[in-house]
Amino acid sequence: GVTGFGFDLVRYLFAGVVDGR
């Protein structure tokens, strides 16, 4: 997500969902 680039990357890689909360 826009408010969590770091988490966004992890989410995208593992979950495949762009949601960096």
UniProtKB/Swiss-Prot annotation:
Report the locations given in the UniProt record. Cytoplasm
What's its top-level EC category? transferase
Q: Which UniProt keywords apply?
A: Amino-acid biosynthesis, Cytoplasm, Metal-binding, Methionine biosynthesis, Methyltransferase, Transferase, Zinc
From the UniProt record, give the pathway where this protein acts: Amino-acid biosynthesis; L-methionine biosynthesis via de novo pathway; L-methionine from L-homocysteine (MetE route): step 1/1
Chief location category: cytoplasm
Which metal ions or organic cofactors does this protein require, according to UniProt?
Zn(2+)
Which GO molecular function annotations are given, in alphabetical order?
5-methyltetrahydropteroyltriglutamate-homocysteine S-methyltransferase activity; metal ion binding
Reactions catalysed, as given in the entry: 5-methyltetrahydropteroyltri-L-glutamate + L-homocysteine = tetrahydropteroyltri-L-glutamate + L-methionine
Q: What is its EC number?
A: 2.1.1.14
Q: Name one GO cellular component term.
A: cytoplasm
Q: Has keyword Zinc?
A: yes
* Any GO BP: methionine biosynthetic process
| Family (UniProt) | Belongs to the vitamin-B12 independent methionine synthase family.
Q: What does this protein do?
A: Catalyzes the transfer of a methyl group from 5-methyltetrahydrofolate to homocysteine resulting in methionine formation.
Q: What is this protein called?
A: 5-methyltetrahydropteroyltriglutamate--homocysteine methyltransferase
